[in-house]
A protein has these predicted regions:
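Short, flexible/disordered intra-domain loops and linkers
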Residues: 55-60, 97, 163, 231-232, ...
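Loop/turn elements at helix/coil->beta-strand transitions in domains of secreted/extracellular proteins
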Residues: 21-24, 38-42, 76-81, 146-149, ...
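Sec-dependent N-terminal signal peptides
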Residues: 4-14
């Protein structure tokens, strides 16, 4: 079935995007010079500084030093931030004796990954976070010129390494967060917590969860990380994810916000775009796991530099696509 779909797309598929801003980005870690992202593109700090435990280490005591660093750097390099919100604070989870979890990011993260004990305390943090970076001129970060508009609520909740809670807990946190953000920042764009691939267990989780959150996010979100066996999906899961969304009556743009490939990256990126991805965020040169070859990285960077900003992509043949731009110009890529 998948082979038939690819053949069909080869001759017919056309994807049109709403605008022509950058279609590319990277996961970033500001402490690593090679992981700070490219100018004029998207960045998704990961895990990033938007962690309740980092910002409010004690109740009522907010420290914005780390978050401000990321925002200021992004402004200086004309990067658009996709901010991942992590709703966990050690002090808060201790208040109702939550069990500790193994941190997926070591000591720099948090010791607890459960649902907040007090949604009111979480709301206070969330409102403070949005208020500082929404750009409304009230209580903004000093020097803020490029507000944060895109908010990614949580990360791969179907994996216990990132969230120690039930599906119902996730749904409650997600919908609650979305409502709070939208009320405070009406032009905010809510990005679904990234699905950790499209393996059977992922599909089962999201087939149940998506109908419960679909009215509370604007962008659907999928991740593709190569497994321990080093295997990758040719379309970086975008085709399976699109099919899942359709099966639960979700009609939203698709972003691929963690892209790791073990084959030719340009081909994989093109296949993902052809299957409906509007934005692809690379995991970055120093991300854990399998590394992209230097040759592959060079080709990917050249592809991004030469073809970014397109408004639509059309498959012409099995190894040729056509990109269209806002001014009507077209570019052909053979890969």
């Amino acid at each position: 079935m998948k082979k038939l779909l690819i053949i069909f797309l080869t001759f017919l598929f056309l994807t049109t995007f709403a605008n022509s801003q950058s279609r590319f980005g990277e996961l970033t870690e500001i402490r690593d010079e090679k992981m700070r992202g490219k100018d004029n593109q998207w960045v998704r700090p990961h895990p990033g500084p938007f962690i309740w435990n980092h910002i409010e280490k004690e109740k009522g005591n907010f420290n914005w030093e780390e978050t401000d660093k990321y925002v200021l750097y992004a402004q200086e390099h004309n990067q658009t931030i996709l901010a991942t919100i992590w709703p966990h604070a050690n002090w808060e989870q201790k208040s109702c004796k939550r069990k500790k979890a193994k941190s997926p990011f070591g000591k720099k993260f948090t010791k607890y990954l459960s649902k907040p004990c007090s949604m009111d305390d979480y709301k206070t943090f969330l409102l403070m976070l949005i208020d500082r970076y929404d750009g409304d001129g009230s209580n903004d970060m000093p020097g803020l010129t490029k507000p944060i508009k895109y908010w990614d609520i949580m990360n791969e909740p179907e994996f216990k390494m990132f969230f120690k809670g039930s599906e119902e807990d996730f749904v409650e946190i997600f919908n609650f967060s979305s409502k709070v953000i939208k009320e405070k920042q009406p032009d905010a764009v809510i990005v679904m917590a990234g699905a950790a691939g499209m393996f059977p267990e992922n599909i089962k989780y999201w087939k149940s969860a998506l109908p419960k959150i679909k009215d509370h996010f604007d962008i659907a979100n999928i991740h593709h990380i190569s497994g321990p066996d080093g295997q990758c999906d040719k379309e970086l899961w975008v085709d399976e994810f699109a099919a899942l969304l359709k099966s639960v009556d979700v009609n939203k743009p698709i972003w691929l916000t963690e892209a790791m490939t073990c084959g030719p990256p340009v081909k994989a990126w093109v296949n993902a775009f052809l299957n409906g991805a509007e934005l692809i965020i690379d995991v970055g040169v120093n991300a854990p796991g399998k590394k992209m070859s230097k040759k592959g990285r060079k080709k990917l960077n050249k592809f991004i530099a030469n073809y970014d900003g397109f408004t639509s992509i059309k498959s012409i043949s099995e190894k040729k696509v056509e990109f269209t731009y806002k001014d009507g110009t077209k570019k052909i890529l053979e890969f």
